[in-house]
Amino acid sequence: MDINASLIVQMLVFVVFIGLTMKFIWPPLTKALEARRKNIADGLAAAEEGRKELELAEIKSKEQLTEAKTQAAHIIEQANQRANHIVEEAKNKAREEGAHLIQLAKNEIEQEYNAAKTELLKQISTIAVAGAQKILQREVDKASNDRLVDELVSEI
């Protein structure tokens, strides 16, 4: 094998090229690769953190939804109890008012009954006095007595 000067020059140029490449090109290239690796790692870490936050947010939202449903059920139960209480109060008030009105009606009926009874007694007294006057004005015999009683009965 013949080593000539051109092969040595080519080897020297290659070594110089490798040296220059290692000094000027390789460091920025490794920095760019390292920055890219770091950027990808940061992106993956951020994605993992985002996934964890999403899971926490889902858990929290489920808890809040469960709590909201519980509160809604409690509010509905309270509203139903209040409505039932109001209905019962209204029923009791209506019963009391009905009993009061019935008592007032009974009192009014009793007053009307007593007034009618008093009026009837006045009329009977008037008729009895009128009948007694007629009897005293006439001579009393059996036939006239019967006729007078019939007249009084027809007037009553």
Swiss-Prot record:
Q: What membrane topology is annotated for this entry?
A: Single-pass membrane protein
Q: Gene3D superfamilies from the xrefs?
A: F1F0 ATP synthase subunit B, membrane domain (1.20.5.620)
Keyword Coiled coil (UniProt)? no
Classification via CDD domains: ATP-synt_Fo_b (cd06503)
Function of the protein: F(1)F(0) ATP synthase produces ATP from ADP in the presence of a proton or sodium gradient. F-type ATPases consist of two structural domains, F(1) containing the extramembraneous catalytic core and F(0) containing the membrane proton channel, linked together by a central stalk and a peripheral stalk. During catalysis, ATP synthesis in the catalytic domain of F(1) is coupled via a rotary mechanism of the central stalk subunits to proton translocation. Component of the F(0) channel, it forms part of the peripheral stalk, linking F(1) to F(0).
Which molecular function GO terms apply here? proton-transporting ATP synthase activity, rotational mechanism; proton-transporting ATPase activity, rotational mechanism
InterPro entries from the UniProt entry? ATP_synth_B-like_membr_sf, ATP_synth_b/b'su_bac/chlpt, ATP_synth_F0_bsu_bac, ATP_synthase_B_chain
Source organism's superkingdom?
Bacteria
Disulphide bonds in the chain: none
Q: Which Pfam families match?
A: ATP-synt_B (PF00430)
Q: In which broad location class does this protein mainly occur, judging by the first location in its UniProt entry?
A: membrane
Alphabetical list of SUPFAM superfamilies matching this protein: F1F0 ATP synthase subunit B, membrane domain
Cellular component per GO, a single term:
plasma membrane
Q: Does the keyword Protein biosynthesis apply?
A: no
**Organism in which the protein naturally occurs:** Coxiella burnetii (strain Dugway 5J108-111)
* Localization annotation: Cell inner membrane
- From the record, what ranges are coiled-coil? none
List membrane-spanning regions. 7-27
> Could you identify this protein by its name?
ATP synthase subunit b
The protein's matches in HAMAP family, at most eight in alphabetical order, are given as: ATP_synth_b_bprime
Q: Tell me, how does this one assemble?
A: F-type ATPases have 2 components, F(1) - the catalytic core - and F(0) - the membrane proton channel. F(1) has five subunits: alpha(3), beta(3), gamma(1), delta(1), epsilon(1). F(0) has three main subunits: a(1), b(2) and c(10-14). The alpha and beta chains form an alternating ring which encloses part of the gamma chain. F(1) is attached to F(0) by a central stalk formed by the gamma and epsilon chains, while a peripheral stalk is formed by the delta and b chains.
State the family named in the UniProt similarity comment for this chain.
Answer: Belongs to the ATPase B chain family.
Alphabetical UniProt keywords: ATP synthesis, Cell inner membrane, Cell membrane, CF(0), Hydrogen ion transport, Ion transport, Membrane, Transmembrane, Transmembrane helix, Transport
